[in-house]
């Protein structure tokens, strides 16, 4: 669920997840033993009850009389200030600004492919290896200079293309139609072809491995959601540092960094961080609408709401990995609520996790509570929901401004017929034209979302957290809200839907339309960075 669940790692080669996209489509009871008949049985009326009979009246559970191990105040303190692992000893007694980027990245997590790699093979690598959930593109195998990326947003856009829900500009219609036809026929599509029809992406930001964290936190606090780390004096990439990694680093080593640690006990409402402009989707809407919405608006996750705008779940672009089999395509017609149940089922079977991830906080949540949830769920954002005052004896809860649910761009109805010619081979996937039954799901109107969470009132992203950390440390990151406003302004003149995939986290928490990255490029100028070509 979230920008949030890593793909399961497996040893050895496994079939590509997109390979199947090109293929067709009471427990037992125990009976009591028979009663023994004795020659001289006493009168049943004078029979003394057996031990078993006397125990038929189930005694009360010991838990009913057991004293709680934690008082209410102690439990609240635990929620407000969750414990951490204690941090890495090598960072103790160090100023975080002296930590080098090379100390935080793992070269073994860098995955390269070339532009002639098929989308199918790239997807297989992406799903198998998990974090940092991105594949770097290079021109040849003998270089480690990255010129592009492929991530789950690209995969989402590709699937929408194949099923006929991508709508390019007029000059790209022919290219999109040809790619969609190849995808439905099971023909390999190189990443180079996907790159040709895509928009310009968030610029690739490259920092030397000797750069300190002040440089990275300024970039992240301005809205960029990942940076590449290269060997000093070269373009050879040795690591990828993400917003989530940096937030996790500060959280686990909080005791070592007092200027950041003093922020954790404060309440969200007092810090005044986040945005009240949120893009969301109703739980009764089809999953295809949610995926198209994320693609059109350039966001990586959406809150799923009931009829009263209460948060009842979360859908992330990473969850699109569950749709890479042709047998999963009917899910596109199912409701978002049903897809959430599929996500939870997959977590239980593959990850062995029975917990229900919680992606919301309230204005009275501490920053520590919020960051702990972001790290635990590996999410890029937490939805803020209305909540009553934490103490009935305190002042009444102030009127909380509800979230501004921005109307999204029009969603294309699911196609009723095949787009393009009928696939030429017998293993071609069944298109969405089929009228196969969709698994029934409970309606959003029947769910009491208020008891699950609360009414959506805003969102807090990793960008907001890192921007706060940067300011508290005396740095001057650019205001991510300005990039959000610029994005909304540019969207009014552009409704283009395309393969724009490496989007900025500074705009992923709000509902602005996808626009130019020129404003974000200005934001990172002067920070001593190197840029690569960001198209992929």
Swiss-Prot record:
Entry's Gene Ontology cellular component terms: cytoplasm; nucleus
Places the protein is found: Cytoplasm; Nucleus
Domain of life: Eukaryota
BP terms from Gene Ontology: cellular response to glucose starvation; regulation of mitotic metaphase/anaphase transition
Domain CBS residue range list: 105-170, 198-256, 274-331, 335-391
Region (Disordered): 1-71, 473-536
InterPro entries linked: AMPK_gamma/SDS23_families (IPR050511), CBS_dom (IPR000644), CBS_dom_sf (IPR046342), Ssd23 (IPR016711)
Keywords from the UniProt entry: CBS domain, Cytoplasm, Nucleus, Repeat
TM helices/strands, residue ranges: none
Primary site of residence: cytoplasm
Stretches with biased composition (Polar residues): 57-71
Basic and acidic residues biased stretches: 1-13
MF GO annotations: protein serine/threonine phosphatase inhibitor activity
Biological role stated in the UniProt entry: Involved in DNA replication and cell separation.
Similarity remark: Belongs to the SDS23 family.
Name assigned to this protein: Protein SDS23
């Amino acid at each position: 669920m979230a920008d949030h669940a890593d793909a399961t790692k497996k040893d050895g080669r496994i079939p590509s997840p997109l390979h199947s996209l090109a293929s067709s489509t009471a427990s037992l009871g125990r009976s009591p033993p028979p009663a023994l008949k004795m020659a001289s049985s006493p009168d049943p009326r004078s029979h003394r009850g057996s031990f078993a009979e006397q125990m038929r009246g189930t005694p009360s559970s010991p838990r009913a009389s057991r004293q709680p191990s934690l008082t209410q105040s102690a439990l609240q303190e635990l929620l407000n200030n969750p414990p951490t692992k204690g941090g890495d000893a090598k960072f103790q007694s160090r100023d975080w600004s002296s930590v080098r980027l090379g100390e935080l990245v793992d070269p073994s997590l860098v995955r390269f492919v070339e532009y002639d790699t098929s989308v199918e093979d790239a997807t297989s690598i992406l799903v198998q290896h998990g974090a940092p959930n991105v594949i770097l593109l290079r021109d040849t195998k003998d270089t480690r200079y990255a010129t592009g990326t492929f991530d789950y947003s690209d995969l989402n856009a590709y699937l929408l293309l194949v099923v006929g829900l991508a709508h390019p500009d007029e000059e790209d219609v022919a290219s999109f139609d040809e790619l969609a036809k190849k995808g439905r026929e099971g023909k390999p599509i190189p990443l180079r072809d996907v790159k040709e029809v895509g928009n310009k992406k968030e610029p690739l930001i490259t920092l030397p491995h000797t750069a300190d964290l002040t440089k990275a936190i300024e970039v992240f606090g301005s809205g960029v959601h990942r940076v590449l780390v290269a060997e000093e004096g070269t373009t050879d990439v040795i690591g990828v540092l993400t917003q989530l990694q940096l937030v996790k680093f500060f959280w686990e080593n909080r005791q070592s960094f007092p200027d950041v640690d003093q922020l954790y006990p404060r309440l969200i409402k007092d810090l005044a961080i986040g945005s009240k402009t949120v893009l969301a989707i109703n739980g009764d809407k089809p999953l295809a609408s949610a995926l198209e919405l994320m693609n059109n608006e350039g966001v990586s996750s959406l809150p799923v709401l009931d009829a009263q705008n209460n948060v009842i779940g979360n859908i992330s672009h990473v969850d699109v990995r569950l749709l890479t089999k042709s047998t999963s395509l009917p899910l596109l017609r199912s409701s978002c609520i049903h897809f959430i149940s599929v996500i939870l089922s997959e977590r239980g079977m593959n990850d062995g996790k029975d917990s229900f991830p919680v992606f919301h906080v309230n204005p009275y949540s501490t920053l520590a509570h919020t960051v702990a949830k972001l790290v635990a769920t590996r999410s890029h954002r937490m939805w803020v929901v209305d909540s009553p005052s934490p103490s009935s004896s305190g002042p009444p809860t102030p009127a909380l401004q509800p979230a501004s649910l921005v109307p999204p761009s029009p969603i294309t109805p699911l196609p009723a017929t095949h787009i393009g010619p009928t696939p030429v081979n017998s293993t071609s996937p069944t298109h969405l034209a089929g009228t196969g039954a969709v698994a029934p799901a409970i309606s959003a109107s029947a769910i009491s979302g208020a008891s699950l969470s609360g009414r959506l009132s805003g969102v807090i992203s990793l960008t907001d957290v890192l921007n706060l950390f940067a300011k508290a440390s005396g740095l001057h990151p650019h205001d991510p809200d300005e990039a959000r406003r610029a994005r909304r302004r540019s969207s009014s003149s552009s409704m283009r839907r395309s393969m724009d995939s490496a989007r900025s986290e500074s705009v992923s928490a709000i509902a602005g339309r996808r626009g130019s990255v020129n404003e974000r490029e200005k934001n990172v100028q002067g920070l001593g960075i190197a840029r690569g070509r960001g198209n992929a």
